[in-house]
């Protein structure tokens, strides 16, 4: 059982996934730092606040920190854009798979069925 587990872990897909998760978490930290330390100060110049994460409004005593949401949206958009660029670049580098040959059309299938039915009637 231990050998099966080792064989499973050493397969390419599992290792690729593990590397992807590790790099992804490191990249998320990098993007968070980019948003917090570079993008937020630029946006705060326009918002008039030193820190966007401190933006909030209160309704009936409930505090809604929409500044944190803005930071999270910026992080998501940056990560999504980078992933888009990576996928686009990889698709350009890797050869595309040839298209599967098209099967017979409906008319060809119906003609074949008709011919088979005629043969059955003649026998």
UniProtKB/Swiss-Prot annotation:
Membrane topology term: Multi-pass membrane protein
PROSITE patterns registered for this protein in UniProt: MSCL
Subcellular location, principal: membrane
SUPFAM superfamilies named among the record's database cross-references: Gated mechanosensitive channel (SSF81330)
InterPro entries for the chain: Mechanosensitive_channel_CS (IPR019823), MS_channel (IPR001185), MSC/AndL (IPR037673), MscL_channel (IPR036019)
Localization in the cell: Cell membrane
Gene Ontology terms, MF aspect: mechanosensitive monoatomic ion channel activity
The entry's keywords: Cell membrane, Ion channel, Ion transport, Membrane, Transmembrane, Transmembrane helix, Transport
Spans traversing the lipid bilayer: 14-34, 67-87
HAMAP family: MscL
Described function: Channel that opens in response to stretch forces in the membrane lipid bilayer. May participate in the regulation of osmotic pressure changes within the cell.
Assembly, per entry: Homopentamer.
Protein name in UniProt: Large-conductance mechanosensitive channel
UniProt source species: Lacticaseibacillus paracasei (strain ATCC 334 / BCRC 17002 / CCUG 31169 / CIP 107868 / KCTC 3260 / NRRL B-441) (Lactobacillus paracasei)
């Amino acid at each position: 059982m231990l050998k099966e587990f080792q064989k499973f872990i050493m397969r390419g897909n599992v290792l690729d996934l593990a590397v992807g998760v590790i790099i992804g978490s490191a990249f998320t930290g990098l993007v968070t730092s980019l948003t917090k330390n570079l993008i937020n100060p630029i946006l705060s110049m326009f918002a008039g606040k030193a820190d966007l994460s401190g933006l909030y409004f209160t309704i009936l005593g409930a505090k809604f920190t929409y500044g944190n949401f803005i930071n999270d949206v910026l992080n998501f958009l940056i990560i999504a854009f980078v992933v888009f660029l990576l996928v686009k670049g990889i698709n350009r580098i890797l050869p595309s798979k040839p298209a599967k040959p098209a099967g017979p059309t409906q008319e060809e299938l119906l003609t074949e069925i008709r011919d088979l039915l005629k043969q059955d009637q003649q026998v």
